[in-house]
């Protein structure tokens, strides 16, 4: 369980597993820092397929990620594996207006 960064030639994928809460803050930030260091021309995705719990601090981390990415010219961030409880929270919080939910 935790947060890790996957990289391909054209994008970075931050994978979150288990609970996405404040305990994941440092690991998420470290992965985000590394992903953004790769450059603004690359895509950025967050894979939430294995997330079973999502709290408000996770929503805040996603918004900070969006702001930092946008400042580097990354306009589109996809949230992958959004289903069930996780998708419901994201839609109720209107995150479907800020991110591509897949």
Where would I find each of the regions flagged by the language model?
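General small-molecule cofactor/ligand-binding pocket signal
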Residues: 4-6, 80, 100-102
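Amphipathic alpha-helical interaction surfaces in cytosolic regulatory modules
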Residues: 19-99
């Amino acid at each position: 369980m935790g947060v890790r960064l996957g990289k391909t030639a054209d994008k970075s994928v931050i994978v979150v597993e288990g609970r996405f809460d404040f305990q994941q803050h440092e690991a998420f930030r470290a992965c985000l820092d590394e992903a953004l260091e790769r450059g603004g021309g690359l895509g950025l995705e967050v894979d939430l397929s294995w997330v079973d719990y999502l709290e408000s601090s996770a929503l805040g981390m996603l918004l900070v990620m969006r702001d930092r990415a946008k400042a580097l010219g990354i306009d589109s961030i996809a949230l992958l594996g959004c289903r069930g409880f996780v998708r419901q929270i994201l839609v109720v919080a209107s995150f479907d207006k800020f991110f591509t939910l897949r």
